[in-house]
Amino acid sequence: MSDSSSMPEFALEATDLRKTYAGSKNAPPKEALKGVDLRVRRGSIFGLLGPNGAGKSTFINIFAGLVNKTSGTAKTWGIDIDRDSRAARAAIGVVPQEINMDVFFTPHETLELMAGFYGVPKEERRTDELLEAVGLSDKRDAYVRQLSGGMKRRLLVAKAMVHTPPVLVLDEPTAGVDIELRRQLWAYVRELHARGTTIVLTTHYLEEAQELCDEIAIIDQGEVIACEPKETLLKRMDSKTLVIDPVEPMAAVPAELAGYDAEIREDGSLAITYRYGEQSVAEMIEKFRASGARIDDLRTEEADLEDVFLALTYHRESA
């Protein structure tokens, strides 16, 4: 990577980005992106979330050069995709959701071929280094058709990195893979990020976004409905839950807690939901003890990204 003073502030920039797909006899035109304004900061791990059909793939494919925008501007690494499409495409690597590779090539041949497409000189190619990084060194000369689904997905990551792009987009990178491989891919994403690569991640696994991303945008029906640091987004759900496991089973919420949002859960625990800074946990515990009940264990639960996602998208559906 070059001196940071010469690098752009944003890895990806979209200003009033619009895409309308043509209609047909049986269907009207489809407005996939409705004036999207979005900035992905250089050096971040950025999560792009949204329901199916929200416009995530259209957004990514415009930057990848696979879809033509209807209007608006898009820049990759400070390069306008209209003014210098070749340089803009060279600044981004995209790992597609679909596994689509020639099964009669080996992983080594696949990466060499892709490096050739990007014009990477032979002496600058990192084919073996990339295979090592994604754990496929021992499959270097095997045919792609002999690889497992997880191995093929890792090879896709290596393919996207042959030209050392400063921006890497992973579209549902762990869809359909087991938990162990998911963790391995997460570790590799962190390693790439540590080397200076800006990561853009789309995923249906909200746990994945919460685990990896430091900034998250939620897109729904072609519009960005939230774009904030992860911690700020999580604070939108400004409630916590105090969960008390009583020593003896409880048939009902104690009268002493009548003024609280409390319930007995199926597992017998008492859950009290409260807002940050408005109610005292110590006071709740004191009132619980005043009822004569004894505490076996207690813990607090906070909203996770799934709660925020559902709340934001549900409110739009019901509006």
Where are these regions (language model features)?
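Catalytic Walker B motif of ABC-type/P-loop ATPase nucleotide-binding domains
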Residues: L168-D171
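Conserved ABC ATPase "signature" region
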Residues: E112, G116-K139
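Walker A (P-loop) phosphate-binding loop of ABC-type ATPase nucleotide-binding domains
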Residues: P51-G55
